[in-house]
């Protein structure tokens, strides 16, 4: 059992007492239902898609019982977004982390990825990558009707949502009567490498008096070149640059995401108010070709330029694939039981993550070279010999592999009823949830193979020079990497293998219950309650002691009480004040929690997982002042704070060797893996403006609008040695700004995104990504005619207009990675019927 501090405990007791009072007061049944408890329905934007969808988002935020930001369907459709990460990155305090230029993860208010929980139609799902981290590149925008980014967490939300809880709303078949259909078809180009971009989506629905269904599918694909340079640099005593290594890479990638799903629903007016079955499948696949040459200087010298330097040369070739998927099926109902509305559901979810990157490393050759790093993002390296003429005496196979399969069964029961509490109309909500998760896989690993002489790699050199934003002074050329992989497979030596000590096997059961009451006052409302979560987990694996395998297990049971309170006060009809106090937890991911380790008694080291890790615990506050000065308009300021204990990160720690081998009890060994730090926190302020010129300027200038937001954040935690570091994902400043014009069926928007530098990954807290910015443009025109009652529009999107280069920096302040991707353009047509 986890015991809370006295302050936390007193707050928990007081809130649970109030929730108990609410349950007792349930006998004082009130008649009718307050409209403030109604679910906000999707608003379908047509004539003014940007303005109308902005108004829907503002109204959803205004009527919420907690701090939340919303993106409506048409906002997603009109933004030039590839996936949900792009969409969420436009909200206040949310920042995108990219992979090869494309949005993948979300840092919610500067917090690590794991502090954000994702749900589909209110049913939370595990992260595909490691059981915790949500990846948003596998969820295309086209299947989504609404995004809800909850910033202050309520008891009916998972306790793991330390920073935020993102709910993806899919489409409701009863939002429109009869048959409907929506189609989107787009084609485009990636400027660097002239890669093709394609997208399509199709959605259809039908609803009658009792029955309805919706079905949808979506597919997006893009071919891209990533122009990459990596560095190993340091500085001498006088501050001059020393070049140890230069790494030139060109990636050819094809990324595709596919989704399909639907919902079958019945609506009644007796005991069964609603019964439904929903299903969703989404996947992301990244096909990657690597062409890489590494130049290691034999005797590094000081200076940004030098001549006739001896270098060893290595070549890396690869054709591999990353893929992750989520499939979820839910059967649920809304039932009336007296004064109660009871909502049971059962959900089956499976997530898969697989990586297989077979790399061929050729080494053992060298030459001399001149270099000039005057432009650090475009290093110039001139070789004395033609790169393609170099011969490599040895070739090694490095098949990198990683996998995780996670199956979850979830039982959920929610119940609510109207009551009178403190003489005021209130809504009492109670709930139970049981999650049974089974995760199996292995961590990222490889086994080196000597493949010298098995095949001639030079015959696969196409002679085609790299597509590059930089100057490619080495004369890099593309290899037929697919042919190389076929040749490797033909030798019978390409295997997807891993050691027993790399395995992940975790069984996790989480049992939760909550009680919550929302009381309506003349001045606003008060929502309060608590959630209790009990975690039972067991991790199995093998301990390798100098080559001898022993089966090991780790298990524990712990309980957390997570109270929260939310006050929403209407100072005026157009002015709202909010303040919330919340608590939460973040459990270790499955790689961190695995029991498997490698032990070397001779070296006194242990490497691997840590099943004794504690869950991270949080307590914090949110407050905001929101001025709704016109329809679809908002000016707000907010602040937030989270205290985090038991921060999980990678480090080396002294341990008693008897923990791993009783014969060595009392001897001190070094454990290298995952440990708990302390004294973590993140805090910040947010500002948000959304407005239009509709009431300020005459036609046609009344079509202009502006949205802008900014967040200023800081964070830190203390490691086991007493040093302080930023939490991964924290940018000191995040900005977003959009200017749009919308009149006469024409819509256009320019969007700017910026985030300051941030730590990533947590395995090296000294390494940071440099500041990043993006400028995107979108426009659409609604066609003024219709053949059969449909509404059609044509659109054009342009992304990364300023052709940005993204940089990463080592702990010594020198650059260690620079990559660019070029602009992209997409044109298409949307038809709604």
Can you describe what each PLM-predicted range is?
Residues 84-87, 104-107, 119, 134-135, ...:
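N-terminal periplasmic accessory domains that precede
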Residues 641-643, 654-655, 660-759, 805:
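Gram-negative outer-membrane beta-barrel transporters
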């Amino acid at each position: 059992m986890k015991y809370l501090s006295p302050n936390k405990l007193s707050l928990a007791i007081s809130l649970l007492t109030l929730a108990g009072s609410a349950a007792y007061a349930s006998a004082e049944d009130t008649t009718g239902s307050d409209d403030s408890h109604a679910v906000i329905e999707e608003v379908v934007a047509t004539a003014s898609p940007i303005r109308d969808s902005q108004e829907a988002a503002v109204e959803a935020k205004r009527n919420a019982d907690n701090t939340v930001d919303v993106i409506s369907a048409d906002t997603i459709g009109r933004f030039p977004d590839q996936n949900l990460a792009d969409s969420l990155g436009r909200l206040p305090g949310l920042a995108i982390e990219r992979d090869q230029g494309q949005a993948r993860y979300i840092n919610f208010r500067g917090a690590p990825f794991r502090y954000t929980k994702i749900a589909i139609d209110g049913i939370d799902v595990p992260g595909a990558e490691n059981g915790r981290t949500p990846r948003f590149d596998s969820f295309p925008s086209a299947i989504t009707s609404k995004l809800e980014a909850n910033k202050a967490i309520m008891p009916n939300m998972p306790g793991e949502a330390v920073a935020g809880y993102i709910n993806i709303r899919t489409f409701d078949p009863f939002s429109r009567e009869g048959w409907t259909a929506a189609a989107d078809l787009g084609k485009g180009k990636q400027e660097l490498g002239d890669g093709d971009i394609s997208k399509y989506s199709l959605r259809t629905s039908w609803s009658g008096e009792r029955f309805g269904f919706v079905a949808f599918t979506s597919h997006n694909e893009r071919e891209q070149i990533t122009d990459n340079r990596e560095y190993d640099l340091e500085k001498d005593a006088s501050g001059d640059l020393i070049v140890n290594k230069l790494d030139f890479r060109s990636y050819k990638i094809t990324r595709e995401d596919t989704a399909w799903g639907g919902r079958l629903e019945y609506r009644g007016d007796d005991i069964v108010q609603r019964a439904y079955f929903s299903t969703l499948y989404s996947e992301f696949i990244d096909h990657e070709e690597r062409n890489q040459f590494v130049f290691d200087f034999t005797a590094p010298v000081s200076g940004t330029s030098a001549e006739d330097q001896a270098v060893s040369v290595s070549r890396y070739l690869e054709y591999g694939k990353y893929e992750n998927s989520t499939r979820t099926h839910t059967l649920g109902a809304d039932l009336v039981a007296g004064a109660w509305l009871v909502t049971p559901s059962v959900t089956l979810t499976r997530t898969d993550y697989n990586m297989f990157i077979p790399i061929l490393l050729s080494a053992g050759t060298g030459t001399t070279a001149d270099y000039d790093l005057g432009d650090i993002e475009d290093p110039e390296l001139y070789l004395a010999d033609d790169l393609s003429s170099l011969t490599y005496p040895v070739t090694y196979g490095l098949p990198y592999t990683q996998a995780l399969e996670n199956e979850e069964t979830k039982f959920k029961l929610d119940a609510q009823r109207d009551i009178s509490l403190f003489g005021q109309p209130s809504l009492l909500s109670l709930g139970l949830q049981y999650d049974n998760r089974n995760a199996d896989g292995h961590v990222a690993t490889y086994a080196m193979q000597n493949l010298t002489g098995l095949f001639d790699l030079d015959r696969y050199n196409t002679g085609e020079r790299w597509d590059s934003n930089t100057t490619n002074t080495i004369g890099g050329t593309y290899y037929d990497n697919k042919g190389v992989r076929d040749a490797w497979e033909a030798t019978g030596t390409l295997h997807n293998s891993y050691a027993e000590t790399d395995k992940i096997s975790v069984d996790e059961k989480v049992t939760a219950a909550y009680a919550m009451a929302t009381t309506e006052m003349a001045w606003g409302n008060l929502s309060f309650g608590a959630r209790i979560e009990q975690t039972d987990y067991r991790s199995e694996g093998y301990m390798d002691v100098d080559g001898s395998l022993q089966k090991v297990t780790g298990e524990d049971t712990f309980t957390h009480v997570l109270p929260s309170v939310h006050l929403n006060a209407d100072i005026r009809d157009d002015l709202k004040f909010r303040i919330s106090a919340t608590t939460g937890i973040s459990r270790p991911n499955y790689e961190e929690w695995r029991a498997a380790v490698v032990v070397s008694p001779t070296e006194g080291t242990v490497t691997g997982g840590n099943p004794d890790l504690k869950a991270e615990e949080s307590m914090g506050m949110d407050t905001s002042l929101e001025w709704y000065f016109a329809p679809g308009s908002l000016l707000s300021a907010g602040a937030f704070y989270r205290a985090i204990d038991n921060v999980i990160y990678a480090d080396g720690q002294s341990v008693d060797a008897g923990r791993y081998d009783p014969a060595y009890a009392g001897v001190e060994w070094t454990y290298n893996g995952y440990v708990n730090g302390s004294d973590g926190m993140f805090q910040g302020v947010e500002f948000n403006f959304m407005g239009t010129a509709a009431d300020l300027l005459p036609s046609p200038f009344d079509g202009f609008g502006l949205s802008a937001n900014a967040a200023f954040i800081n964070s830190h935690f203390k490691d086991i040695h007493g040093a302080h570091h930023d939490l991964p994902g924290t940018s000191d400043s995040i900005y977003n700004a959009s200017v749009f014009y919308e009149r006469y069926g024409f819509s256009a928007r320019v969007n700017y995104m910026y985030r300051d530098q941030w730590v990533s990954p947590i395995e090296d807290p000294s390494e940071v990504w440099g500041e990043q910015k993006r400028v995107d443009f979108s426009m659409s025109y609604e066609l003024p005619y219709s053949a059969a009652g449909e509404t059609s529009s044509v659109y054009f999107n342009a992304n990364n207009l300023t052709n940005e280069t993204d940089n990463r920096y080592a702990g010594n302040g020198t650059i260690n990675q620079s990559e660019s991707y070029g602009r992209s353009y997409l044109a298409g047509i949307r038809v709604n019927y």
